Amino acid sequence: MFMFYIKWIKITANQKESRIDFAPGLNIIYGPSNTGKSMVLDCIDYMMGAGTHRFDVNLKVEKIQIGIDVNGEGLSISRDVNTQSFEVISHVDGIETSTYKLKGGKKNPPINDVWMKLFDIPLDTKILKTQEGKPQALTVRTFYHTFIIDEDRIHDKA
């Protein structure tokens, strides 16, 4: 079983890099308005397979990179903005260094495979989509909201 945490996120925008580091356990991102809190969450969402980003075009975001510690081993995922490709460099058994795609295909698996392996969830897991019992594939984006809580959801519950 994998124990993992996001170790860092690096954003390249307007040919400059910004990096935020995380620690194992609960990380809380807080601060005044317009300081980048939502940007961090948007980056994580985008790296977990969001088809589109919510980055302000004026920021000129070019690339997102994320570093993950998996039982002390390194895994990095890189994605150029407005592409469907993810470059994964893995030192983790069971996760291949390769080019992954948003949806996957014959040559490239979907990025969801990396995340599902990290969560130790079988890749072919299905869940019920509708009240009629129609099945759909379980993806990390299906349950993303359970471990990434944004400020809007906190205010909704207050």
Regions found by a protein language model. Give the residues of each.
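Extended, charged alpha-helical "arm/stalk" segments used for dimerization and assembly
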Residues: 82-158
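Extreme N-terminal "head/tail" segments of very large remodeling/mechanoenzyme assemblies
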Residues: 1-77, 82, 87-88
